[in-house]
């Protein structure tokens, strides 16, 4: 990256990419990634054991708040016995 120092345009590539501060920053970045990765795995496991997030009424013990899960809509084939018949398809014979 180009920058200006004392009125002169300098290129930061003149510094060594393997300087000590880069190596230590890289090491601590990897260490923090590993720690956060395993911490999030363990937090997910604790939440599942305690029942967090699986029950919608666990936070509302006094009766206020949203009701339980609404009934699910059934997905499946179209019921042809309800409603009027569709109109005939338009089109010619091709002549």
Swiss-Prot record:
It is found in: Endoplasmic reticulum membrane; Cell membrane. InterPro entries: Se_SelK/SelG. Pfam families: SelK_SelG. It comes from the Eukaryota. The keyword DNA repair does not apply. GO terms for biological process: calcium ion transport; endoplasmic reticulum calcium ion homeostasis; protein palmitoylation. It is a single-pass membrane protein. Keywords: Calcium, Calcium transport, Cell membrane, Endoplasmic reticulum, Ion transport, Membrane, Selenocysteine, Transmembrane, Transmembrane helix, Transport, Ubl conjugation. Residues 47-95 are annotated as: Disordered. Cleaved by CAPN2/m-calpain in resting macrophages but not in activated macrophages. Macrophage activation up-regulates expression of the calpain inhibitor CAST/calpastatin, resulting in inhibition of CAPN2 activity. Truncated SELENOK proteins produced by failed UGA/Sec decoding are ubiquitinated by the CRL2(KLHDC2) complex, which recognizes the diglycine (Gly-Gly) at the C-terminus of truncated SELENOK proteins. The record marks 82-83 as: Cleavage. One of its GO terms (cellular component) is endoplasmic reticulum. Coiled coil: none annotated. The chain crosses the membrane at residues 20-42. The keyword Lyase does not apply. Interacts with DERL1, DERL2, DERL3 and SELENOS. The SELENOK-SELENOS complex interacts with VCP. Interacts with ZDHHC6. Belongs to the selenoprotein K family. Required for Ca(2+) flux in immune cells and plays a role in T-cell proliferation and in T-cell and neutrophil migration. Involved in endoplasmic reticulum-associated degradation (ERAD) of soluble glycosylated proteins. Required for palmitoylation and cell surface expression of CD36 and involved in macrophage uptake of low-density lipoprotein and in foam cell formation. Together with ZDHHC6, required for palmitoylation of ITPR1 in immune cells, leading to regulate ITPR1 stability and function. Plays a role in protection of cells from ER stress-induced apoptosis. This is Selenoprotein K. It comes from Bos taurus (Bovine).
């Amino acid at each position: 990256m180009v920058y200006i120092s004392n009125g002169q345009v300098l290129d930061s590539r003149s510094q060594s990419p393997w300087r000590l501060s880069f190596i230590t920053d890289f090491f601590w970045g990897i260490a923090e990634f590993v720690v956060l990765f395993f911490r999030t795995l363990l937090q997910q496991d604790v939440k599942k054991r305690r029942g967090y997030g699986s029950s919608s009424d666990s936070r509302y013990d006094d009766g206020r708040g949203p009701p339980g899960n609404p009934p699910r809509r059934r997905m499946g084939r179209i019921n042809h016995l309800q409603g009027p018949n569709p109109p005939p398809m338009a089109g010619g014979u091709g002549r």
